């Protein structure tokens, strides 16, 4: 177990914000997670549990304990894969395809760790990880006991789970079990995925093979290519991917807006609700490529806020609030950060 005082968190947030914590604890096994839980109980210090830092905006030093999982390992049994909470999510996607297990292709290149996937219910291109998760293994901080949590008890919804609400800071996740399909069924109906799916330098979708392999590999490569074109590399330009959640509005609200903005993109949620891309609204407000101080909006994807170099967390918050205000004024819709602001 790593136990470090006065620790820099710059390498633990993809915005690249310089901030420190009073103490940093990193566990690499269930037993070490139980030891961390004991320390948290006995010290009574405030604590923050982080993953890969790809969904985190630090606005200040954290005067408490930051906890991080470094549990690695992937174990496959039939169509299930159990992964250590410290594994990189995209490596899980790659490993699943190598094992002939399908379902996560659309979630390729989403940054972050396995543990965070279960907390955030990550999703992209019409697929959410909740559809793959079967159980979460964790240590309960209050008791130090191991728990196996059924995914059906997590109340998963769009970018939501009980881990973000009433279970917040209650568990240290040690591993997640996913259940995949042994038959490849592509999900191509969200956004511009179908039209962008080009097999290498070959033809468009009309010749797309639905066989079990290598089509899944091509789909993963297409998703990676699209994300690579639209999203900045955090190693070059600090960012947390999609900063805002796409709002879900009542159908009446959508229809009223569509009368004014007939080209407004939307996605059906259910009979009474529609999802509207926040990035489109931000773009319509003229924010794409604009900046405030050292914080900016990416010039290819308005949903992404970037650290232009030396930005503080507070500068990014100021930009966030300015965008929220403009979207509310223009569309009458509140948009909320997907990023966890500390």
Regions found by a protein language model. Give the residues of each.
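Anion-binding (especially nucleotide phosphate/pyrophosphate-binding) glycine-rich loop
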Residues: 1-143, 153
């Amino acid at each position: 177990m790593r136990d470090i005082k006065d620790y820099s968190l710059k390498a633990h947030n993809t915005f690249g914000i310089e901030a420190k914590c009073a103490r940093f604890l990193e566990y690499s096994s269930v037993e070490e997670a139980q030891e961390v839980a004991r320390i948290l109980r006995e010290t009574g210090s405030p604590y923050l549990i982080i993953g890969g830092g790809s969904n985190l905006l630090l606005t200040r030093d954290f005067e408490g304990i930051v906890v991080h999982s470094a549990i690695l390992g992937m174990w496959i049994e039939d169509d299930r894969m159990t992964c250590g909470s410290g594994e990189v999510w995209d490596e899980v996607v790659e490993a699943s395809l190598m094992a002939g297990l399908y379902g996560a292709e659309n979630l390729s290149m989403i940054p972050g760790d396995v543990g965070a996937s279960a907390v955030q219910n990550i999703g992209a291109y019409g697929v959410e990880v909740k559809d793959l998760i079967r159980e979460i293994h964790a240590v309960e901080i209050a008791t130090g006991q191991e728990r196996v949590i059924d995914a059906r008890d997590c109340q998963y919804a769009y970018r939501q789970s009980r881990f973000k609400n009433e279970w917040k800071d209650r568990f240290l996740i040690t591993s997640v079990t996913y259940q995949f399909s042994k038959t490849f069924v592509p999900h191509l109906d969200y956004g511009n995925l179908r039209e962008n799916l080009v097999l290498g330098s070959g033809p468009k979708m009309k010749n797309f093979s639905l066989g079990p392999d290598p089509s899944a590999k091509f789909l993963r490569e297409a998703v990676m290519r699209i994300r690579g074109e639209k999203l900045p590399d955090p190693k070059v330009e600090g960012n947390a991917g999609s900063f805002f959640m796409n709002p879900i509005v009542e159908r009446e609200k959508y229809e009223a807006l569509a009368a004014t903005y007939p080209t407004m993109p939307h996605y059906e949620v259910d009979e009474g609700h529609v999802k509207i891309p926040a990035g489109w609204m931000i773009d319509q407000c003229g924010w794409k490529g604009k900046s405030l101080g050292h914080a900016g909006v990416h010039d290819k994807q308005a949903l992404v806020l970037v650290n232009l170099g030396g930005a503080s967390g507070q500068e990014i918050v100021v930009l966030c609030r300015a965008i929220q205000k403009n979207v509310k004024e223009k569309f009458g819709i509140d948009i909320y950060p997907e990023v966890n602001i500390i």
